Amino acid sequence: MPAPEFAPEWRDHADPRVQYRPFFVVRLMSPSNNTNDAERGYIIPIGGAEEKLNNPEILDRFVTICGGKNARISIIPTASERDDTGRNYEKLFRRLGVRHARVLPFETREECQSSPDLDYIDKSDGIFMTGGNQLRLSTTLGGTEVAQRIRRRNAAGMHVAGTSAGAAFMAEHMIAGGAEGSTPSPDMVTMAPGLGLTNKFIIDQHFSERDRLGRLLTALAYNPFAVGIGLDEDTAAFIRPGDDLEVVGSGGITIIDPTDLSYSSMDRARRGEPVSLVGVKLHILIAGGRFLTATREAHAEQLQ
């Protein structure tokens, strides 16, 4: 089977002013609740541009976690404006040995409420959300039956992966866009409600490649209860059911922990002014590195 072709990832140009969408959407998209003592599935944000041909380590591991060749993997290409994105990932998963890979083309909110494809979510072992524009995900899927089923199934054990825009969409608080640079500033990031699989993290992607440290720091200054995950390309955080994570891939993950934040000038800074943050911890983890969320401990990769 010929290798599928993939276009370059979408680069966001959203209005950099910080804003949140209406609160009722946030309520509908609040984190998954596990009510039946089942173990939550993995949450797997990928930084974009994951290796697809020579050594697709991230996708291979996702397939293995989902059950291997007999897994049912649903692909949601809503974020992408390209007609072939979903089909290319379907071909890719089949090349990796998956017998039951299927595209679920949710393009409108009406389809997200009543499409026959809704039932396939309940049969899936894994969901994969492609890259594109995360605002297409939040405005199309947000608060719909699709989003609620994904959250319920993840709480019951189904695994959910997303690359680029699909990664940003996973958390309750989503970075929708922003500016480049390393120093935080009040107007450096745009926030919107995400899918709500977790409220423990705020996720950004294409992190080092697009110089996004400042906008993630800004997001955490507004939401200091969360841990920031900055994902380089071809790098993923495999977040386990207990919210500990392991790094997989060829790049690094920047973990920003504001637990001990003792001072922030965010409340006094004006548009365009730099913001002071004191007490923030930053870790750089590569493949094999781990972060224990409950204790806020980072561990480097094990030497062989």
Language model feature labels by segment:
Residues 6, 20-24:
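Aromatic (phenylalanine/tyrosine) cluster motif
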Residues 120-123, 143-157:
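Catalytic-core regions built around general acid/base machinery
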Residues 129-131, 150-174:
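Catalytic nucleophile loop
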Residues 134-144:
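Glycine/threonine-rich flexible loop motifs
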Residues 26-69, 80-88, 93-95, 175-176, ...:
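C-terminal and late-domain segments of enzyme folds
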Residues 13, 19-20:
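Low-complexity, intrinsically disordered or signal/transmembrane-proximal segments
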Residues 74, 80-123, 129, 136:
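Portal/gating segments that form or line small-molecule/metal binding sites
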